[in-house]
Amino acid sequence: TANAQWRNLFYIWFLSMTAHWYRREHLHANSSLPLLVGPQGCGKSTWCRNLLPPSLRMYYTDSIDFSNKRDAELMLTRFALINIDEFDSVSSAYQSFLKNVLQKPVVNARQPYKRSIQALHRYASFIATCNNYDLLTDPTGSRRFICIEISGTIDNSTLIDYEQLYAQAVAALKNGERYWFTSEEEFSTTRNNEVFQQLPVEEQLFLQ
């Protein structure tokens, strides 16, 4: 990718994902997500799945149904990483719910065979993939989506030292490294996303 900010933004997001697994965050959610944009078959989905070591792959899913709101919220407590595959297929009717889910630090739900409602810890972070470039439809802003263009085929054959990778992430958290985005970083993300913004219908008609 040609995005000079990608390495830093992904690093912060990765630390936040790890922090959620270790229950270091109770008041805020990992409310941003990397959104990989590129042609079909370039290795986006495999790259997302490979972020988790084989021992944790059971906590990865690329199947979430936003029309079933209760199940979608409960997935936050059951999975470590949720990939919104084919992001542009998410109906605009569910965009506000998606934003709400991204920002949820806990899920209030009744456990099976329990009477009282409990606040369940959120473990899941989100990532997404898309084949099309005009994918952002919300005109109110896109600071939560770290859109990144895949300019070639991703090399997914490189072996990853997961033990070392996550040991470094945990060490960074213990040393107090920041795992949330500043307002300046969010502003930069919004500016970068302009190229991925879908034009309003009236503008599309005007340009025809």
Question: What does each of the following model-derived ranges do?
Answer:
Residues A29-S32, M58-T61, S67-Y94, N100-L102, ...:
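Feature primarily recognizes SF3-like P-loop helicase cores of small DNA viruses
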Residues T1-T77:
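P-loop NTPase catalytic core of nucleic-acid-dependent motor ATPases
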Residues C48, L98-K99:
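Short amphipathic alpha-helical segments and helix-helix/interface helices
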